[in-house]
Amino acid sequence: MSDRLAELERAIGITFRDRTLLQTAFMHRSLFNEQPHLLNHLTDNERLEFLGDSVLHFVTTTWLFETFPDQDEATLTNWRAALVSTKGLAECAAQFNLGQYAYLSRGEDNPGGRSRQKLLADLFEALVGAIYLDQGLETARAFIVPFWQARIEQIIHIDLDPTTRLQELMQARFKQLPDYSIEEERGPEHQREYVMAVTVAGRKFTGSGSSKKEAKRAAARKALAAWDKHGFTATAIDAQDERN
């Protein structure tokens, strides 16, 4: 176990003062369901996940606020959601192959189990929580920010041109184009609001704006957010609640 932890420390570039925190970050709850006696001396990683989620949101919020002083709240909120999405965190975890360090039950440790997005995202959150407790906020920030620096340009591209991005993804995945329609026009002539809908893999996403173009972009952005969150699969989109 100590060799595995040392290998992970080298991979992430952080040496823990308290290695039990690092070990706990990779203790999946399923292991304790299968072997409850382990609870006598070990703890699952769910509390660290909870803490890490908060640290990630705080660090991400402050970094975006400081890095993009001219952007409004809505834009920064969209970018933050993309950075800390399950898919985004899973991609961060995959860079260090965090799944291989997880302690899982036999049922969870099946082919492909260690590469599941939800598992990887949870492990990344727990690792951030462990780093914060062991090293403090500045070390946690230094660990997190490089991931965002590497990803933000792509996220900005998606956010600034969502209709083009959605079209590219639909053509690549389903060999078809998004289907847009006007759902509603409301308000007085001088303050008109438009509601546009886009249908993606059988699911409808709506967006509103002061022009048809703006509403179309809002609908595309909402579809992309749902698609990215669920790994861009038709099944996941079909399961996505229409209110999202």
UniProtKB/Swiss-Prot annotation:
GO terms for molecular function: double-stranded RNA binding; metal ion binding; ribonuclease III activity; rRNA binding. SMART domains: DSRM, RIBOc. It catalyses: Endonucleolytic cleavage to 5'-phosphomonoester. GO terms for biological process: mRNA processing; regulation of gene expression; RNA processing; rRNA processing; tRNA processing. The active site is at 53, 125. Its cofactor is Mg(2+). PROSITE patterns: DS_RBD, RNASE_3_1, RNASE_3_2. It is found in: Cytoplasm. Coiled coil: none annotated. Residues 5-136 form the RNase III domain. Homodimer. Digests double-stranded RNA. Involved in the processing of primary rRNA transcript to yield the immediate precursors to the large and small rRNAs (23S and 16S). Processes some mRNAs, and tRNAs when they are encoded in the rRNA operon. Processes pre-crRNA and tracrRNA of type II CRISPR loci if present in the organism. HAMAP family: RNase_III (MF_00104). This is Ribonuclease 3. It comes from Chloroflexus aurantiacus (strain ATCC 29366 / DSM 635 / J-10-fl).
